[in-house]
Amino acid sequence: MTSQTPSLSFEVFPPNPAVGNEKILRALEDMQGLAPHFISVTASNNKYNIKETTVPLADHIQNDLAIPTIAHLPAIYLGKEKVAETLRDLDAVGVHRILALRGDIIPGVEPLKDFKYATDLIEFIKEEAPQFDIIGACYPEGHPDSPNQISDIQNLKKKVDAGCSSLVTQLFFDNERFYDFQDKCTLAGIDVPIHAGIMPILNRNQALRLLKTCENIHLPRKFRAILDKYEHDPESLRAAGLAYAIDQIVDLVTQDVAGVHLYTMNNAETARHIHGATHSLFKHHSQVSAL
């Protein structure tokens, strides 16, 4: 372990274009005051055009708010020409950090063949646009499509060797599983920073979606007890969910995690609450220039 001060970063997502940007822009103004190390902007591989959603929002965060920005790029349904176009769009607005993703496969929709794996995308970006810093995704409890964790970590090593400078994890609720994953990465020769993805569970609907979509994620007994006890008590569930996330973060920082990436769900109040409880543990984004 190292004694380097960890970073705190946020993830946001572009709203439905029909809804408009007013709410997310207000949330981002609030988040700006929290001085995150960076903000990542998600991209959908099936709903909205990246050029019309992710790129403008990343541009605003990077240039208007002066916060280092990472743009997500899921490529399974994009051909090389479309990826190259997206890279040009991001380059034009000075956003040079990308979270390179395969992207989720949509049932009944045939993927394109250019980027079957995230590694294919990473290699393409390194060849076509070497000015970009590439971040990879990783899964402490194994990718749902991997036969086992050994295979998953072998594939992760390929990502890093292809050009990832750092990694961000899928959300998890059991820190011990994250530490075990870190140890296995070290044994596999993966030596880039790994940022731990943390999502506070704040309401019943969010919890139900999680249980349905993230079947590979272990829910510790303490976490399940929160869901069971406060399922029909929204105020207490929110308070307990925030407390659980804060406990996770304090433990991670104690164990010298490289960084914590907070899945904010565009909720500035959540980001502010967690920042208020933990900000002294983290470094300000102006203190450093890279992940």
Which residues are covered by each model-predicted region?
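Conserved N-terminal beta1-alpha1 strand-loop-helix module at the mouth
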Residues: 2-41
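Active-site mouth loops of central-metabolism enzymes
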Residues: 7-23, 69-81, 135-151, 228-243
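Conserved, mostly hydrophobic/aromatic
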Residues: 11, 39, 90, 159, ...
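Active-site beta-loop-alpha junctions enriched in small/polar residues
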Residues: 12-15, 42-46, 72-78, 103-105, ...
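Active-site pocket-lining/capping segments in soluble small-molecule metabolic enzymes
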Residues: 19, 113, 117-139, 187-247, ...
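Glycine-rich, positively charged N-terminal anion/phosphate-binding segment
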Residues: 21-30, 47-67
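Glycine-rich anion/phosphate-binding loops
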Residues: 23, 75-89, 112-117
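Glycine-rich, proline-tolerant flexible connector loops at the mouths of alpha/beta enzymes
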Residues: 35-57, 103-113, 164-178, 264-267
